[in-house]
């Protein structure tokens, strides 16, 4: 994910290492791999665990990688799907308000949007029904089955638009190229709302990525829309050497 997001923002390398290298970005994001995975394929240190609940990538780790790789020029703004008590924060009205705030910046190229979500809330991007003809139908979101991948995932948004019916859709850039159309994955935004709220006992949310100097203003606009800005946890270990704070 970050291997194409960061170079697209003009950050191609750090300390002589290319930011398009998956193993380097995994190191910066403090990813925890499975204990059975061959650590020899990683050129940089990564943690490992035999406990599935302690594997994967945390949202704070992603924010860490963005901040360090950009030399502090980019900042992440975390918006959790649920509030601190565990109730859904991003209900329909707040979700639409958040998209209304983010859309102009995203469409102008001033912001990136990264989702940390439960895949099984989305349309099944490998199902036979997930094809251009069916996706073009007005009832696509009701006739294409939901996914059954059974994982949490990160993916950035690549496009956002409204259909003639007014229904909002987006395109995800999935790092798994066997999904969708070589990783290009149209999805209804309402299903993404459900996906970041999550029903799998894990935390989800949205990371808004902007220039450091633009972060404070965007935080205020998001909060004025009735949406709290707060880092969430998704069960994967957060970095022990870095903590998010506004502007980082």
Name these PLM-found stretches.
Residues 1-110, 200-205, 210-248:
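Cysteine-nucleophile protease catalytic domains, especially the papain-like/related folds used
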Residues 11, 15, 127-131, 184-186, ...:
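General "foldedness" signal
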Residues 72-74, 154, 160-161, 199:
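Broad hydrophobic/π-residue packing in well-ordered secondary structure
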Residues 90-172:
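Active-site-adjacent substructure of cysteine-protease-like catalytic cores
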Residues 138-149, 160-248:
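Noncatalytic regulatory segments and standalone regulatory/sensor domains
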């Amino acid at each position: 994910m970050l291997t194409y997001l960061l170079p697209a923002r003009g950050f191609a390398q750090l300390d002589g290492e290319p930011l398009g290298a998956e193993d380097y970005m995994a190191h910066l994001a403090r990813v925890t791999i499975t204990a059975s995975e061959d650590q020899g394929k990683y050129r940089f240190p990564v943690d490992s665990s035999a406990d599935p609940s302690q594997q994967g990538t945390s949202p704070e780790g992603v924010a860490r990688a963005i901040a360090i790789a950009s030399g502090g020029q980019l900042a992440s703004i975390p918006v959790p799907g649920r509030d601190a008590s565990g109730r859904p924060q991003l209900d329909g009205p707040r979700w639409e308000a958040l998209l209304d705030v983010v859309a102009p910046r995203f469409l102008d190229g001033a912001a990136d949007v990264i989702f940390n979500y439960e895949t099984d809330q989305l349309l099944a991007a490998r199902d036979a029904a997930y094809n251009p003809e069916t996706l073009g139908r007005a009832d696509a979101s009701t006739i294409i089955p939901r996914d059954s991948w059974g994982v949490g995932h990160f993916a950035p948004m690549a496009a956002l638009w409204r259909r003639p019916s007014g229904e909002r859709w987006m395109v995800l850039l999935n790092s798994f190229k066997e999904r969708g159309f070589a990783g290009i994955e149209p999805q209804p935004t309402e299903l993404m709302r459900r996906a970041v709220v999550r029903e799998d006992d894990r935390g989800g949310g949205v990371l808004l990525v902007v220039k450091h100097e633009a972060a404070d203003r965007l935080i205020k606009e998001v909060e004025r829309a009735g949406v709290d800005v707060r880092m969430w946890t998704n069960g994967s270990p957060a970095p022990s050497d870095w903590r998010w704070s506004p502007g980082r």
